[in-house]
């Protein structure tokens, strides 16, 4: 019997599944910012206090990320990701249920925990299955993530105004709509598990010490790693390179979530209508697509060593422009989007580039996302606190600039070709 197309080209089906999962990792949370005004008015909660709502997924990321790799190793990556998609759908529905505000908060917690699992496991899957095309597939992954987040940001306000029931759909209906792709992603992921020739290997946890999926000659990591250092008592948490990746991940995420949460209220305060303010957030994330897709090109050039440090420079220019020349608001938003998209793609690329094996990539991903999102969770709350304390936007935007400067500093170190859990830090070239 001749193998089916899915069997002969399992990588295509797996790639489609990975990208569809990525399409759900930001859309369910990026729509919150443009709806803060509606949520505040409906629930009677101060808009600045709702910065905590944006921080809850990040806190969940920090708490759950260290567990995700262990769950994948124990139960299989594909099964755990499937469960996370089901939980993501349940959390999205729960968050939109009418009644007590508890539904909003508890549903958001479940959403954050579900996204955290997929965030950690997918980079390890990409490292194993696409080791010869790591930068390109990672860029596509982050582009889908950013693109659907952009779409959600731009449509939630118009959707909230669509007639439905006794009035309009409102913010609850709009947030429910933000999870529209979850059922499709769940089905395609399940189909990929069942029909791919690689289903059994895909469902098996990534090896700890070094049997990544074979690729073209010279592309896969070695099966035996003579430079592999003992993991020691602290494992990846005791590795300096891992802490550099964590810092870079954390500062870029902190800056992004401050901006994506508060950009719409900032635009509204400058006299831009609510719908236009939501489109501004969409514009930020649409422009981040170009930033994400540019990273593979930058990593091939002579400036690859300095790419992590150069990316946040664009963000610094953009935020300075928002402060000094707000009349050019859309232009600064686009520039910041380019920086944020490239920052995210760079961060996810580092999980693979700074690890020799899929197992090491999974541990690095879990550690960096746990600590990184713990840093990021401070951002939206601190931004809202400064806004309430000072009554203006200057101090909060200066906090964003300080965060981007910290990302730049981390980028100076993480750009060096060194890998985690190795006796000799430099990665070297063969």
Description of each model-found segment:
Residues 64-76, 291-304:
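Helix-to-loop junctions at the C-terminal end of transmembrane segments
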Residues 63-102:
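Conserved MFS/SLC helix-loop-helix module at the cytosolic interface between two early adjacent transmembrane helices
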Residues 100, 132-197:
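Helix-loop-helix hairpin linking two adjacent transmembrane segments in secondary transporters
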Residues 358-400:
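A late C-terminal transmembrane helix in Major Facilitator Superfamily
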Residues 44, 76, 97-102, 131, ...:
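Helix-breaking motifs and short loop linkers at transmembrane-helix boundaries and internal kinks
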Residues 107-143:
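Cytoplasmic helix-loop-helix junction between adjacent transmembrane helices
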Residues 78-81, 305-309:
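Primarily marks hydrophobic transmembrane alpha-helices of the MFS/SLC 12-helix fold
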Residues 32-33, 240-292:
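Extracytoplasmic gate region of multi-pass secondary transporters
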